[in-house]
Amino acid sequence: MPDRNAHFVQWPWWAVCCWLAIQVAATATEPTDIRVVAAAPDGGRQAVAGRLLVEARDGSLLVETATQQLQVLAGDQIISRTMSRPAEPLAPRELGRQTLAELPAGFRLLTTRHYLICHDTSLGYARWAAALLEQLHQGFHTYFSRLGLPLQPSERPLIVVIFSGRRAYEAAAARDVGAASHSIVGYYNQLTNRITTFDITGLDALQDDRTASAGQAGLALLNSPRAASLVATLVHEATHQLAFNTGLHQRLAPVPVWVSEGIATYFETPELATTRGWRTIGGVNRPRLDLVRRQFTPGLLDRIITSDEPFRDPDEALVAYAHAWATIFYLAKLRRTEFASYLQQLSEKAPLAADSADLRRQSFRAAFDCGPEDLEQPLLRYLATLPSSP
């Protein structure tokens, strides 16, 4: 499983987004491109071009660039702006070239049907990771289609950055997550739309780069004591990335953390006996189940459904994750129709839309015809029916 704090990240852009959300004037309903010249932090000027997503009352803008990155431009820093018709997306190779230019020397590009894998690992490792990601991509779409929520096809390649070693990974990750880079082993960043991680097992550095077979690389990796953590991290973060790129969630929309993390933990469960280390969606996530059984907390269900704060508290985050997994597991197994209706509601939330505890409670009640507190006892009874650890 992922490291204890693998997904507990207080993103540095969270406060900025909250500030912008308070004063949103309009969300773009039709694709519109914009070119903005704004004052740069160093006193010069910066040019930003891309798709306009949100405009705030004070003139601040949320723009998505051609490399899929979101940029917030303060209204009082904007010098000029020009509207234009939507540009064609970058070709995969050009997107890859521009992404590689941002990474340290030695990174290479592996292109698959849906992914751009930027890596300084062996080719075999990259191919193993790519095969796992493509398997997840297919399974993700199939699962939600069967749930009654057909998703949008990915319009653009999804970018994944894989470092071979932890030291280089931490140096790069520090720019996104600060000091948390030392305690997490991978993350999906909504602002860059990228997954960043590294070879948790440490085995790839010992591989001969001429070993280009995904099967050979996977066999070595999955025999590692840390294989479960490697697979769970990659699947967990890739699930987030898929959710925010297929219409299940919109980037920077107020999707409750319990939903996004609950879905990711629902998908992440490794199966190390398989060639890729993962196969089944919705298997019992044993570490999460064991934790929620030991530390089920009355009232926490209501708090995670109406607020994200438990996930930001280091003393409570792990238990909150376990409760999120258990709740999603219960709803997905026993209340599928209402669960699909609830996810449909959340998919319609726009970037930086209004959010509050009351709105979250109303949304939950509208879908499930009960309050979060009413779910505790049915959830506990269901968890008691699941088999104990072997």
Write out the residue ranges for each language-model feature.
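Bacterial N-terminal signal peptides
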Residues: P12-Q23
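Compositionally biased alpha-helical segments
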Residues: T27-L147, A172-A173
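Short, surface-exposed beta-edge/turn micro-motifs
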Residues: P31-I34, P157, W325
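Solvent-exposed coil/turn segments that connect beta secondary-structure elements
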Residues: A66-Q68, D76-I78, M83, S122-L123, ...
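Short intrinsically disordered coil segments
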Residues: L90, R175-A179, I281
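Juxtacatalytic substrate-recognition/specificity segment
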Residues: P104-R251, P256, P351, L359-A366
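Acidic/His/Gly-enriched intrinsically disordered linker/tail segments
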Residues: S183, Y187-T197, S229, T233, ...
